Amino acid sequence: MEEEGSPDIIIVGAGISGLSTAVGLHRLGIRSMVLESSETLRATGFAFTTWFNAWKAMEALGVSQHIRSLHDRLEGWVVGTISAGTPPTEMLFPESEEYESRCVQRKLLLEALAGELPEETIRFSSKVVHIELSGCYKKVHLSDGTILKTKVLVGCDGVYSVVGKWLGFKNPATTARLAIRGLTHFPEGHGFGKRFFQFYGDGVRSGFIPCDHNTVYWFLTHTSTDIDEETNSEILKEFVLNKIKDLPENIKNVVETTDLDSMVMSQLKYRPPWELLWSNITKDNVCVAGDALHPMTPDIGQGGCSAMEDGVILARCLGEAIKAKSLKGETEENEEEGYKRIEEGLKKYAGERKWRSIDLITTAYTVGFIQQSRGKWMNMFRDRFLSSYLSRMLLKKSHFDCGSLVP
């Protein structure tokens, strides 16, 4: 059944990129509807590290101060090997804004973004199953039989995006690595200070990052075939503890203290960068953003950060194209003109995001390969020469300013 009064802009997916786009449009006075397949906001992965580019995006969206108030600023990181014997190295971050970094809980960020939107912007339990052409419009079919008609369709629906599939994207490639993530709460304080601890070697990379005085986010990526995505949480915890057995006791205690329902494992996936060279990021009045556009391995910490970049830039390009607070003022006579403006706006967005996406995907995959490679010579080369270079590379890729919502 086709609904009356369908919105002019439909965003599929209430994740970071979807809500960032919706908030950006709302700041410009443009109404949108966000379709989310689950019953509530989802925060898969627990937390992620935010760098300079993420804070620029949050400032543009108007949520930066609130998020800062909930999370401690990191003062530096400690990098070492996963095995005993080699002392770790420490790097302190300068106090300038270019080095601002915090470990942000996804749930708190999503709630902050959702809180900026008018009521009923997000429509939960709304799974998209089919997209149909209808002149200058697209008809979006939901699993409950509802049909929504829209002038702009934005796919922010993750790595297996329905919108991305409509555009011609293939499913993401699967790596040989798995990631185990957890969030640990310490009622009396964790005692870690405000540093990002990272350890790697022998096919393993792990990190322990304080979000605030009481909460630590941790992860471990590996190439083991001993476990898979069906492995239960108790075995996962034992596996992680075995991999980090040579690390200091306070580090191991983070994993030991983690509740079993506060752990998750997933296989790492990415978009082959060459696919972005010939695939359509946008077509007609449809585009993709976030993981639907550029799924990447987590090795440079840019998945969530770049998703916010997408949201700001997409909202700005659409705002320029629409040139009004609403599309409702268009008559049938100039509807085609409005369609062309939107099409050009989305092409501009695609042009801005293509090479940035290719760069991030390629860098993340390469850094992950180097950090988790096995072998005596690779280990020696990495430990002696590459650790500081890789750390600088991570910071370099974060030095990107998406700009404001208004050009």
From Swiss-Prot:
Molecular functions (GO terms): FAD binding; monooxygenase activity
Listed GO biological process terms: response to oomycetes
Keyword Oxidoreductase: yes
GO CC terms, sorted: plasma membrane
Top EC group: oxidoreductase
Disulfide bond residue pairs: none
Keyword set, alphabetical order: FAD, Flavoprotein, Monooxygenase, Oxidoreductase
Cofactor names: FAD
Enzyme Commission number(s) from the entry: 1.14.13.-
The keyword Repeat belongs to this UniProt entry's keyword annotation: no
Tissue: Expressed in seeds, seedlings, roots, leaves, flowers, pollen and siliques.
InterPro entries on file: FAD-bd, FAD/NAD-bd_sf, MOase
Top-level division of the source organism's lineage: Eukaryota
UniProt subunit comment: Monomer.
Family: Belongs to the 3-hydroxybenzoate 6-hydroxylase family.
Protein name as catalogued: Monooxygenase 2
Organism for this UniProt entry: Arabidopsis thaliana
